[in-house]
């Protein structure tokens, strides 16, 4: 699977052939630090002074390299596919090898960082439900609508919490139909490809 880069990312990476290979390696280290701790403008300014370029140019170069490494790591691109993806950029063979080495050295760490950054969503534990219907009343003249009360038990990071929801049967039926439609859509080839690429 080849990584497709937008024109903007190609422009950001176009700065790399203009600098020494040691600088590109340092940019790779800064890119991994960027993932761990976030952006640090002082590092960009210091590198920009040494290279006699604007700090925006350095920042764009690091961000382009960060995108290249994170997307490649996220998709678990093979060595050959990574080389083919970078070859399109028109870099020298030495720079392509250096980028490949950066990718191979850091892909496990980048995947670990990305998994830590992913939001922790609650997961289903148990469900209780009750149908509430008023059987008789002298004062009500309109039709009585039943209500479905749902008690949803969830787990999140080892903590158990409970959500109580109430709805009418028509809305619940519509919700069930939408969920069944979504599950059917997950069986399509397009969705399978998307899910495979997310992992």
Swiss-Prot record:
Gene Ontology CC: one annotated term: cytoplasm
Sequence ranges assigned to domain COMM in this UniProt record: 123-190
Subcellular location: Cytoplasm
InterPro entries linked: COMM, Commd2
PROSITE patterns from the UniProt entry: COMM
Tissue: Ubiquitous.
Main subcellular location: cytoplasm
Annotated keywords: Cytoplasm, Transcription, Transcription regulation, Ubl conjugation pathway
Similarity comment text for this entry: Belongs to the COMM domain-containing protein 2 family.
Subunit structure: Component of the commander complex consisting of the CCC subcomplex and the retriever subcomplex. Component of the CCC (COMMD/CCDC22/CCDC93) subcomplex consisting of COMMD1, COMMD2, COMMD3, COMMD4, COMMD5, COMMD6, COMMD7, COMMD8, COMMD9, COMMD10, CCDC22 and CCDC93; within the complex forms a heterodimer with COMMD3. Interacts with RELA, RELB, NFKB1/p105, NFKB2/p100. Interacts with CCDC22, CCDC93, SCNN1B, CUL3, CUL4B, CUL5, CUL7.
UniProt function note: Scaffold protein in the commander complex that is essential for endosomal recycling of transmembrane cargos; the commander complex is composed of the CCC subcomplex and the retriever subcomplex. May modulate activity of cullin-RING E3 ubiquitin ligase (CRL) complexes. May down-regulate activation of NF-kappa-B.
Cross-referenced PANTHER family: COMM DOMAIN CONTAINING PROTEIN 2, COMM DOMAIN-CONTAINING PROTEIN 2
Record protein name field: COMM domain-containing protein 2
Record organism: Homo sapiens
């Amino acid at each position: 699977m080849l990584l497709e880069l937008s024109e903007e990312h190609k422009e950001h990476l176009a700065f790399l052939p203009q600098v020494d290979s040691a600088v590109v390696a340092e940019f790779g280290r800064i890119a991994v630090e960027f993932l761990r701790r976030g952006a640090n403008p002082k590092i960009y300014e210091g590198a920009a002074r040494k290279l006699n370029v604007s700090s925006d140019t350095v920042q764009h170069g690091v961000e382009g390299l960060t995108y290249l490494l994170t997307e490649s790591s996220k998709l678990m691109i093979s060595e050959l596919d990574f080389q083919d993806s970078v070859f399109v950029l028109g870099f020298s063979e030495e720079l392509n090898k250096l980028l490949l080495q950066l990718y191979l050295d850091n892909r496990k760490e980048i995947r670990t960082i990305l998994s830590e950054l992913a939001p922790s969503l609650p997961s289903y534990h148990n469900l209780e439900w009750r149908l509430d219907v008023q059987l008789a009343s002298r004062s009500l003249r309109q039709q009585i609508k039943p209500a479905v009360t749902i008690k949803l038990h969830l787990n999140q990071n080892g903590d158990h919490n409970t959500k109580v929801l109430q709805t009418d049967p028509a809305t619940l039926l519509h919700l069930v139909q939408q969920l069944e439609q979504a599950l059917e859509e997950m069986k399509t080839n397009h969705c399978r490809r998307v899910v495979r690429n997310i992992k």
